[in-house]
Amino acid sequence: MAEKVIYRGTGRRKTSVAQVILTPGKGNIIVNGVPALEFFPYPTLVQDLEQPLVATGTEKDFDITVTVKGGGFTGQAGATRLGIARALLVASEDYRKGLRAVGLLTRDARIKERKKYGLRGARRAPQYSKR
C-alpha cells in the first residue's frame, strides 16, 4: 500500500497555536473541521491564510487541514498562515526564498504586555493629583 504524503507545520501568533497538515489535493482549506470561509468571520482573514500559497503559486496543489486553539480570530489566522508557510518549506525548500521575501516565515513576536502592580494596566497609571 502506498503511503500518503503529508507535510506538517506549526504556527503561533499571540496566544494561538495552529497545527497544519498539507496533503496533495485541490486547494481545500479546512479549519477545525469546518471550511475556512465558514470558520473565520471575515473574508480578509481567509485571504491572509492564502498568502503563502499565492506567494509560492500552489493555491490548487494542496488540501490543508488545520487544528487551531487559543486566542481570537486574528491570532488564529496569523498562526495558521505561519503554519502553512512552514509546512510548504517541509514540502520543498525551493519555496524559502519567495516566502522569506514576502515576510511569511517570521514569527510575529508581539504579545500582550503583562499588568504591573500599582498600575491600572500594563502602563496606565492611576490619576495623579498634585494637591
Curated annotation (Swiss-Prot):
UniProt superkingdom? Bacteria
GO terms of biological process kind = translation
Query: Matching Pfam families, A to Z?
Result: Ribosomal_S9
Is this entry keyworded Nucleus?
Answer: no
The Gene Ontology CC terms held by the record are: cytosolic small ribosomal subunit
Q: Which SUPFAM superfamilies match?
A: Ribosomal protein S5 domain 2-like (SSF54211)
**Which InterPro entries does this chain map to?**
Ribosomal_Su5_D2-typ_SF, Ribosomal_uS9, Ribosomal_uS9_bac/plastid, Ribosomal_uS9_CS, Ribsml_uS5_D2-typ_fold_subgr
Q: Which UniProt keywords apply?
A: Ribonucleoprotein, Ribosomal protein
The reply on keyword Transmembrane is: no
- Member of which family? Belongs to the universal ribosomal protein uS9 family.
Report the protein name in the record: Small ribosomal subunit protein uS9
According to the entry, what is the taxonomic lineage of the organism? Bacteria, Bacillati, Mycoplasmatota, Mollicutes, Entomoplasmatales
